[in-house]
Every structure is written in C-alpha cells, then in structure tokens.
Amino acid sequence: MLLKLIVALSLTLTLASATSDPKGWFCSFECNDWNQLEMACQKEKDCFEKTNNQFTNETVACMQPCWDLGIPCRTQCYKVYDQCTSDCPYTVPNPYECFTTCFKEAFAEVKPQIPKANLDE
C-alpha cells in the first residue's frame, strides 16, 4: 500500500513539476539512468522501513546519499539546458529544433558516465 502511495505521489509531483520546473522535468528524462541508480539505492537502504513508514528527518538523512548520486548528471544537464535556452530564444525561426539540436550535441559531450562500481551492484 505504501509503495502505491509513493508511486502515485511521485507521478503527481512529476506532472506538476513539468509545468512549474521544466528544466528539472526535462533533465529527469535525460538523467534517467542516474535516477534508476538513485531508486536502487533507496530500495537497498529501505529508509521507510527503518522509520516505521514515516517520512521524518531520519528518513531524509537515510535517503540523502541516494539523492546525491544523481547530482553529477543533473548539474551538467541544468548547465546545458540553460545554455541552449539562451542560445535558442523564441525569436529564432524554429526554437524547438534549435534547442533540441543544441542540447543533444552539448549534453552528449558532458553527460557523466555512471561509475563502473555502481553498474556492478
């Protein structure tokens, strides 16, 4: 039951963030492999079980190392997103095409690889 609640809450927050935080929403897709690493870490740590299914400061402290795993990818994604948004204003003939081309090329150069130690787990 708790898992269903967490999934429903995550979906709701993801949809809401698509409009309120387009950069975060966009980068969540671009860094999906890193997000999977975070989720595997959370599952392994089982922080909610340790806090009797309560979301407390202890839960946050338990989960923080997992959340931090995705920082390298999100940091690079946010930088590239901002740069391409700046380089492709709505005044260019096709801003969406400009942005997607800019992002694809620039992010391919800087997206960090998941450390091999994490891939073996």
From Swiss-Prot:
Glycans are attached at N57. Interacts with the p75 low-affinity neurotrophin receptor. Evokes neurite outgrowth and modulated calcium currents in pedal motor neurons. May be involved in target-derived trophic support for motor neurons. GO terms for molecular function: growth factor activity. It is found in: Secreted. One of its GO terms (cellular component) is extracellular region. Residues 1-18 form the signal peptide. It comes from Lymnaea stagnalis. Its main location: secreted. Keywords: Glycoprotein, Growth factor, Secreted, Signal. Transmembrane segments: none annotated. It comes from the Eukaryota. This is Cysteine-rich neurotrophic factor.
